[in-house]
Swiss-Prot record:
This is Tubulin alpha chain. Its cofactor is Mg(2+). Its EC number is 3.6.5.-. The lineage of its organism: Eukaryota, Fungi, Dikarya, Ascomycota, Pezizomycotina. Tubulin is the major constituent of microtubules, a cylinder consisting of laterally associated linear protofilaments composed of alpha- and beta-tubulin heterodimers. Microtubules grow by the addition of GTP-tubulin dimers to the microtubule end, where a stabilizing cap forms. Below the cap, tubulin dimers are in GDP-bound state, owing to GTPase activity of alpha-tubulin. One of its GO terms (cellular component) is microtubule. Belongs to the tubulin family. It comes from Colletotrichum orbiculare (strain 104-T / ATCC 96160 / CBS 514.97 / LARS 414 / MAFF 240422).
């Protein structure tokens, strides 16, 4: 018994990411669209352990342990009428009547407050059905109203009710150039401030970086959100694959925190994935373990726009899937450490966590020319806690400052019952976060002044 994991998908970004993730899980476990075993499924290794993600009903159907919440009815109505309507439990699709209008305060204070008890109640019901609940995976965006506001509210409630369970977030982070809302910087800063204490580990993904990967590696001239989400789903799947399938080195949720988070506040690992390659090119490439490992350290394969060569790595988790043996993986790491461009902080000599899983990576089949991922024998996902991600925070803070210096758009937030002081408080917290990253990167780390903080 590996322990169950509950997926929470909040807001439009979380819901659409959820669709792609479950689409992939069904494929990996050999289940059809309605959650029943699909007789035509190939490559399925006796289905792995279903319990982690699915509840089995008495008539042999598998129901995802997942909850979809959005204050805006339309994304969830799409699930209710879409191809997977038979799959999800209708009680676990919760939609509001009016949306959060890209406003953190609406998601956190006014509209979100009315829904949160109902949502916690449903979570409790699913959690009570579990033998040993291991934790929560929370999918949301930092830029939208529901994702940022309601996401923060729900995490606050989860940490009071399920304090000991691990809470891992997948957060879609506002990209430098691609923006879906003017007030994204406000929402993201406010949301980060209120979740930083309540989340154990937050994997950041920014749309621009994933767009670039799709454009460059999959030759999709204009990637859609489906393309992006399928790529992110691969990473989500490899993070949880060792809970579901056998491997040489299994990794559970708590191990990510233990190995990736050196200080409670510095819990924002970067993710990268290799190989991202289209079916037309895959015949001409060799995917040796070492090459894949090196690819992960290329800025081109990372899911946040920042340059790790400017920072130092504190900890790295490499999760291999498919045909990989520990010896090759260790050799790849040794070769990597020998490269001069790879900087580890001095106070963390080993720096690497390995996971190896025998279940081969699968890709959702796509029409030729639609830029699907090529089926490959092995893949690697890398989660790395690097000080370079501070670049992403300082970009965000800069945008926040530009708007806040003129108090632009602030009245929308205050009108929903927020106090203006919360803006400056959140901004100070992020300034402190940037400073934390600076201190960690400084090699001569003075223990005595750092002790008061941690």
């Amino acid at each position: 018994m590996k322990g169950e994991i509950l997926h929470l998908h909040l807001g439009q970004a979380g819901t659409q990411l959820g669709n792609s993730a479950w689409e992939l899980y069904l494929l990996e476990h050999g289940l059809g669209h309605d959650g029943r075993p699909d007789p035509s499924a190939k490559d399925v290794v006796d289905g792995g352990s279903y319990e982690t993600f699915f509840t089995e009903t008495s008539n042999g159907k598998y129901v995802p342990r997942s909850l979809f919440v959005d204050l805006d009815p339309s994304p969830i109505d799409e699930i209710r009428t879409g191809g997977y309507r038979q799959l999800f439990h209708p009680e676990l699709l919760i939609s509001g009547k009016e949306d959060a209008a890209n406003n953190y305060a609406r998601g956190h204070y006014t509209i979100g407050k009315e829904m949160v008890d109902n949502v916690i109640d449903r979570i409790r019901r699913v959690a009570d059905n579990c033998h040993s609940l291991q934790g929560f995976l929370i999918f949301h965006s930092f830029g939208g109203g529901t994702g940022s506001g309601f996401g923060a509210l729900l995490l606050e409630r989860l940490s009071t009710e399920y304090g000991k369970k691990s809470k891992l977030e997948f957060a879609v982070y506002p990209a430098p150039r691609v923006s879906t809302a003017v007030v994204e910087p406000y929402n993201a800063v406010l949301s980060t401030h209120s979740t930083i204490e309540n989340s154990d580990c937050t994997f950041l993904v920014d749309n621009e970086a994933v767009y670039d990967i799709c454009r460059r590696n999959l030759d999709i001239p204009r990637p859609s959100y489906d393309h992006l989400n399928r790529l992110i789903a691969q990473v989500v799947s490899s993070i949880t694959s060792s809970l579901r399938f056998d491997g040489a080195l299994n990794v559970d949720l708590n191990e990510f925190q233990t190995n990736l988070v050196p200080y409670p506040r510095i819990h924002y690992p970067l993710i990268s994935y290799a190989p991202v390659i289209s079916a037309s090119k895959s015949a001409h490439e060799s995917f040796k373990v070492q090459e894949l490992t090196f690819q992960c350290f290329e800025p081109n394969n990372q899911m946040v726009v920042c340059d790790p060569r400017n920072g130092k790595y504190m900890a790295v988790a490499l999760l291999y899937r498919g045909d990989a043996v520990p010896r090759d993986c260790n050799a790849a790491i040794a070769a990597l450490k020998a490269k001069s461009s790879f900087n580890l902080v001095e106070w963390c000599p080993t720096g690497f966590k390995l996971g190896i899983n025998y279940q081969k990576p699968m890709a959702v089949p796509a029409a030729p020319g639609d830029g699907g991922l090529a089926p490959v024998d092995r893949s690697v996902s890398m989660l790395s806690n690097t000080t370079a991600i501070a670049e992403a925070w300082s970009r965000l803070d800069h945008k926040f400052d530009l708007m806040y210096s003129k108090r632009a758009f602030v009245h929308w937030y205050v009108g929903e019952g927020m106090e203006e002081g919360e803006f400056s408080e959140a901004r100070e917290d992020l300034a402190a976060l940037e400073k934390d990253y600076e201190e960690v990167a400084a090699d001569s780390y003075e223990g005595d002044e750092g002790e008061a903080e941690y």
